[in-house]
């Protein structure tokens, strides 16, 4: 989930093998590959466990002369028992995902994300004093780390279902509800009782942004349902939290290969940002590497070539407990921002690319809301506002939510109270973010845990 706002730097192509994923299979044309094509790159004005088979390998060494002995029967029985034992608890996830993770991982230990060894010695802490100074935050806490990994596994399993089922003709409302129902089922927190959704659930409303809408769109009550088309570019951005530790990850879905270069550009840029992240890395420099990777691509649409531009008005961000947007930002363009990443911090490294202007403005409608973390005690004259604030505190805290979530709780006639909370600075409203009409935008995002001994891309999967 991007946070609302830079040229230069060297781009290192796949600096580590460990970061090579199947994302690189998407072909990309560097800038200039289509010099013989027409087009000026503008859309116009803004006026518009690998398990075995359960067989004991030692049986292959049994002497054939022993076949007639009574022992064979006993050994055969043992083999059968072993085979049965190996299948015990080997439950598989359903589609749609509804088997709780507590049943799939009865030991309560969840898969580790992709570990990335620090390559630059200047980013490695070498003294005990420095390590003690920087060893703070969340990732040194084993319980919190396991919560992160649990949330990441839920994210992977739910998006696996998305990849299996999404197709032209899909309803965005049904897709959003399916994602959120899957997250709640796997975490065993339906969020219908006060406080339950604060133990585990959605980290923010499911983002389903189409085409020139880059971010912050979700289907809400009263809106006409949108049906996915073959020529659409869909960004799917959703968060999962366990005890307030939020995993924020996003990807782009297309059905027409004409958009392959756009997808490749953004995927490359995100992986570049992940490679550059680390203790003492400066966010302005990371933005430069991201921009160089992103803007080395171009895409041809309907015979016209467009450069892929890094979007400037939205950024990656650090993540705090129960707060998907912390105080630090990671731009997608080079800047002079000398802010450093520090030991123990968690970041959402995301990038957005566009065939349009590369600058987003507020679109019509409302994506969602969140309570301001530093909102003070304010007298609210409206009883509806006071009641709504109580509901927000009990069910969401500072986690973003949307109108669908309020309707799901049975809350009615809350718009007047919501407007009061917004006007008093207690609640923030998020509109959709759009580039110029006719343009296309793409997004990829991962959550990374910053550690001097090596970062963990907690949300990495076999899909991206």
Curated annotation (Swiss-Prot):
Give me the stretches of Basic residues compositional bias.
70-86
Identify the stretch(es) annotated as Disordered: 1-106
Example GO molecular function = metalloaminopeptidase activity
**GO annotation, cellular component aspect:** cytoplasm
State how the cofactor is bound.
Answer: Binds 2 divalent metal cations per subunit. Has a high-affinity and a low affinity metal-binding site. The true nature of the physiological cofactor is under debate. The enzyme is active with cobalt, zinc, manganese or divalent iron ions. Most likely, methionine aminopeptidases function as mononuclear Fe(2+)-metalloproteases under physiological conditions, and the catalytically relevant metal-binding site has been assigned to the histidine-containing high-affinity site.
- Give the UniProt record's GO annotations in the biological process aspect: proteolysis
Q: Which residues bind a divalent metal cation 1?
A: 237, 248, 445
Listed EC numbers: 3.4.11.18
Keyword tags: Aminopeptidase, Cytoplasm, Hydrolase, Metal-binding, Protease
Obligatory cofactor(s): Co(2+); Zn(2+); Mn(2+); Fe(2+)
Q: Where in the cell is it found?
A: Cytoplasm
Q: Which CDD domains match?
A: MetAP2
Q: Where is the composition biased (Acidic residues)?
A: 37-53
> Main location per UniProt?
cytoplasm
What the entry lists under PROSITE patterns is as follows: MAP_2
Catalyses which reaction(s):
Release of N-terminal amino acids, preferentially methionine, from peptides and arylamides
Binding sites annotated in the UniProt record for a divalent metal cation 2: 248, 317, 350, 445
- Superkingdom assignment: Eukaryota
The UniProt annotation places substrate binding at 216, 325
Give the matching HAMAP family: MetAP_2_euk
Please give the function described in this protein's UniProt entry.
Cotranslationally removes the N-terminal methionine from nascent proteins. The N-terminal methionine is often cleaved when the second residue in the primary sequence is small and uncharged (Met-Ala-, Cys, Gly, Pro, Ser, Thr, or Val).
Q: Which family does it belong to?
A: Belongs to the peptidase M24A family. Methionine aminopeptidase eukaryotic type 2 subfamily.
- Read off the PANTHER family from this record: METHIONINE AMINOPEPTIDASE 2 (PTHR45777), METHIONINE AMINOPEPTIDASE 2-2 (PTHR45777:SF1)
Protein name (database record): Methionine aminopeptidase 2-2
Organism of derivation: Talaromyces stipitatus (strain ATCC 10500 / CBS 375.48 / QM 6759 / NRRL 1006)
Q: What is the lineage of its organism?
A: Eukaryota, Fungi, Dikarya, Ascomycota, Pezizomycotina
């Amino acid at each position: 989930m991007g946070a609302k706002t830079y040229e230069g730097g060297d781009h290192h192509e796949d600096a580590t093998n460990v970061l090579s994923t199947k994302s690189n299979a998407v072909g990309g044309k560097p800038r200039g590959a289509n010099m013989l094509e027409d087009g000026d790159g503008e859309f116009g004005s803004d006026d518009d466990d690998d398990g075995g088979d359960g067989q004991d390998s030692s049986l292959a060494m049994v002497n054939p002369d022993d076949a007639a002995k009574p022992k064979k029967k006993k050994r055969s029985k043992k083999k059968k028992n072993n085979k049965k034992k190996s299948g015990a608890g080997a439950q598989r996830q359903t589609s749609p995902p509804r088997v709780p993770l507590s049943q799939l991982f009865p030991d309560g230990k969840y898969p580790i994300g992709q570990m990335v060894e620090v390559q630059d010695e200047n980013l490695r802490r070498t003294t005990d004093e420095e390590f003690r100074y920087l060893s703070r935050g969340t990732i040194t806490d084993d319980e919190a780390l396991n919560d992160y990994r649990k949330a990441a596994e839920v994210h992977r399993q739910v998006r696996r279902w998305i990849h299996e089922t999404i197709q032209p003709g899909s309803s965005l409302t049904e897709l959003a509800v399916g994602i959120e129902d899957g997250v709640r089922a796997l975490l065993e927190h339906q969020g219908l009782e006060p406080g339950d959704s604060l133990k585990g659930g959605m980290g923010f409303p499911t983002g389903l942004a189409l085409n020139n809408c880059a971010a912050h769109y979700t289907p809400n009550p009263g809106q006409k349902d949108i049906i996915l088309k073959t020529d659409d570019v869909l960004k799917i951005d959703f968060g999962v939290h366990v005890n307030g530790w939020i995993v924020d990850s996003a990807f782009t879905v297309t059905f027409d290969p004409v958009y392959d270069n756009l997808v490749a550009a953004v995927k490359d840029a995100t992986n570049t940002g992940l490679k550059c992240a680390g203790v003492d890395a400066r966010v302005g420099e990371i933005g430069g590497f991201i921009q160089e990777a992103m803007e080395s691509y171009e895409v041809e649409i309907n015979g016209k070539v467009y450069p892929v531009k890094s979007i400037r008005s939205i950024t990656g961000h650090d993540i705090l407990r129960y707060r998907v947007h912390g105080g630090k930002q990671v731009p997608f363009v080079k800047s002079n921002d000398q802010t450093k990443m520090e030991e123990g911090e968690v970041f959402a490294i995301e990038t957005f690319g566009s065939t349009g202007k590369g600058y987003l403005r507020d679109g019509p409608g409302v994506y969602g809301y969140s309570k301001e973390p530093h909102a003070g005690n304010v007298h609210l004259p409206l009883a509806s506002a006071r009641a709504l604030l109580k509901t927000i505190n009990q069910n969401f805290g500072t986690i973003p939510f949307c109108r669908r979530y309020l309707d799901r709780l049975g809350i009615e006639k809350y718009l007047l109270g919501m407007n009061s909370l917004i006007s008093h600075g207690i609640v923030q409203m998020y509109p959709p973010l759009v580039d110029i009409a006719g343009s296309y935008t793409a997004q990829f995002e991962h959550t990374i845990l910053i550690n001097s001994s090596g970062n963990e891309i907690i949300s990495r999967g076999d899909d991206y």
